[in-house]
Amino acid sequence: MSATHVWRAVLISLLLSPGLIAQSGGAASSTTQCNLDDGRQVYMRYNAVSAKNEKLSNGKPWTPGGSPMTLFTEAQLTLGSSMIPIGAYTVYPIPARDHWTLAVNKNVTPGAGYDEKQDLARAPMETAQVAQPSDTLEVAFAHVGARCTLRIYIGKTASFAEFTAK
């Protein structure tokens, strides 16, 4: 069995685990993915929370529904000028009035708090206001070539960050 098949099996099992937890009464979890041209994939798991129930604090890492988003990647990625190796990471959007920042963190221990010293990558996000507000958190990838652009929509805010596969 090739390393790619092993990684896929691990990622699929990790992605299915939250669905089982959600069925047993835990927080609802959603997943979005980006399929790269060479067949490798990038996944983001997050809690699809209501925009009305979330409090975003300027300059503070945001954990939708009390849990960070989780990034799984089968490809080496860059975010800004930082390299992100193949693996699993926590992702923290950091809202601000005019722009957001995206932090990719090495600590994937369940229940662990955010520790900036564990950041592997940080990059500014393009941020805009949209005319039609989103009632729930929506996270999606837009794929072009070797790039997966992460799109986060909550309320009237839309923020974007670009990951590039190596």
Where are these regions (language model features)?
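Generic detector of short alpha-helix boundary/capping microenvironments
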Residues: 10-11, 27, 69
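Cleaved targeting-peptide boundary
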Residues: 23-30
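N-terminal secretory signal peptides that target proteins for export/translocation
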Residues: 1-6
